[in-house]
Amino acid sequence: MIKFQSLNQSKQFLRIFKKKSLNTKYFTIYFEKNLSSVKKNDKKFLNISFVMKKNIGNAVIRNKIKRKLKSAVQKVLKEKQSVDLNYTYVIFGRNNVYKDKFQLIFDEVNDMFKRIKQIAS
């Protein structure tokens, strides 16, 4: 099983924000190729962070949006395997995620990771 590893330093976020990005109705995803793959004890990690602006609802709404996006990425990892583990991702959630159904969000996340794979190759 692939585990998520979050970015934890502001300079890591700033470096990724200067790289490529893709926009959708539900989120903006920034991505950058890793210099080395992260493996600990033969476990694979995906470098990904979910970020929200403070002007979107209250903390409960922001956390629900992050949970929906995170579960959509987990489902893509399990079913489709279209996520490239050699990249670092930062996903900015938008307010539309809170209102819409999970299947729409899942389809959008899956399409975004396919587009990133096409851009990478």
Q: Residue spans of the language-model regions?
A:
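Positively charged, solvent-exposed patches that mediate nucleic-acid binding
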Residues: 1-121
